[in-house]
Amino acid sequence: MTAPAYPRVASLKTAAAFRAHLIRSAIPIDFDDELAAPPRSPLAQPIEVDGVRVGNRFCILPMEGWDGTPDGEPSDLTRRRWRHFGISGAKLIWGGEAVAVRHDGRANPNQLLLTAKTQPAIARLRDELVSSHRERFGSNADGDLYIGLQLTHSGRYARPNVYNRPECVSCRPM
């Protein structure tokens, strides 16, 4: 049996061609024929999330920069990235960073770590993001800014001390 052939999305040059592909593929997705520029763009419109008004629908998703300090605090690169989140215009910062809750749960030795010692430095990340957002968009621009923090434990994928440590599959030798 041969695998089905799918057209490359880039080959669908018009809205009509894309719509015909969706119909042929029985994919019930509606879309606008023309993209609207802000402020008319649907992505530029506010949205309510759990009773909180978020200023637009642009979102920064959690990521691991692998650029924290060995102690788990933000580095200059981490702070720079968070300032850029602030000036991006996105109003939903959904995690910003994957932050380990325990040393042994860090995915790598440079992942941020939330402890009593690192908490003030991590709180300053948020402050820098809000400050850069205000500088770019005005002093009241953070009223509809929604910021969260993704707390993680990497489980069996944790590598808190070295970058490439082999794991023993079984403690019993064969």
Question: For each predicted feature, which ranges?
Answer:
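An N-cap/entry alpha-helix motif that binds or orients negatively charged groups
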Residues: 1-50, 65-71
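Short, flexible loop/turn elements at secondary-structure junctions
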Residues: 53, 64, 153-155
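Short helix-terminating capping/connector loops at secondary-structure junctions
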Residues: 137-145
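Glycine-rich, proline-tolerant flexible connector loops at the mouths of alpha/beta enzymes
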Residues: 92-120, 151-163
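Glycine-rich anion/phosphate-binding loops
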Residues: 66-87, 111-132, 141, 158-164
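Non-globular sequence segments
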Residues: 144-148, 152-174
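N-terminal glycine-rich anion-binding loops that anchor highly charged ligand groups
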Residues: 52-61, 91-98
